[in-house]
């Protein structure tokens, strides 16, 4: 299948990872391509940083997170024959050795605020708490005493505080986490809680 890759002078990914301060991204749940489902992500300067373009007739169990120029950064795939909702994330477009796995929390006994657990090689890395339907989530680092490493918040106008709705929201990523990983987790949450 042919892919469309717009030409941009430079990618914003390097500047995002070099930052020591929190990175604020605006996530728009809309593809830039006609007849596609996906995401468009901008930095604080309004520059395109990430994009996801899924054609309407393609299955949603294989998603590719790309940079602004269309280079594949991470592949997100639903785990087949899994008891729960489980997603595996790979580097680029590879299908070997997942970087991490995200599993939806289905236990009614455990913490009700917990949405999902993220692990790598049987070690829990992150816990995601909050409500994706309300666009109010925190990604907590389990290795650093549940320190907040990223947050999803509703985006509001500067004047008047009017919310944009559920399709436009902020992703605030602390320096301890890669922005591409935080965006991959946001995409997984959208798949897990699509009807919310």
UniProtKB/Swiss-Prot annotation:
InterPro entries linked: LOR, LOR_sf, Tubby-like_C
Q: Its domain of life?
A: Eukaryota
Which SUPFAM superfamilies does the record match to this protein? Tubby C-terminal domain-like
Pfam families in alphabetical order: LOR (PF04525)
Tell me the function of this protein.
Answer: Might be related to the phospholipid scramblase and tubby-like superfamily of membrane tethered transcription factors.
- Family membership, please give it: Belongs to the LOR family.
Output this protein's name. Answer: Protein LURP-one-related 8
């Amino acid at each position: 299948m042919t892919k469309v890759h717009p030409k941009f002078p430079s990618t914003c990914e390097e500047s995002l990872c070099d930052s020591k301060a929190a990175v604020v991204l605006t996530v728009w749940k809309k593809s830039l391509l006609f007849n596609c489902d996906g995401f468009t992500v901008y930095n604080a300067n309004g520059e395109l940083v990430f994009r996801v373009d899924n054609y309407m007739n393609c299955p949603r169990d294989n998603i590719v997170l790309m940079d602004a120029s269309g280079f594949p950064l991470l592949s997100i795939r639903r785990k087949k024959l899994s008891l729960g909702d489980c997603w595996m994330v790979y580097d680029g477009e590879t299908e070997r050795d997942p970087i991490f796995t995200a599993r939806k929390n289905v236990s009614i006994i455990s913490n009700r605020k917990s949405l999902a657990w993220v692990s790598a090689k049987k070690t829990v890395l992150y816990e995601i708490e909050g409500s994706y339907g309300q666009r109010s989530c925190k990604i907590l680092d389990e290795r650093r005493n549940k320190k907040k490493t990223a947050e999803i918040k509703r985006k509001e106008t500067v004047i008047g505080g009017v919310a944009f709705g559920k399709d436009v929201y902020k992703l605030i990523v602390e320096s301890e986490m890669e922005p591409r990983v935080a965006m991959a987790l946001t995409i997984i949450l959208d798949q897990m809680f699509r009807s919310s």
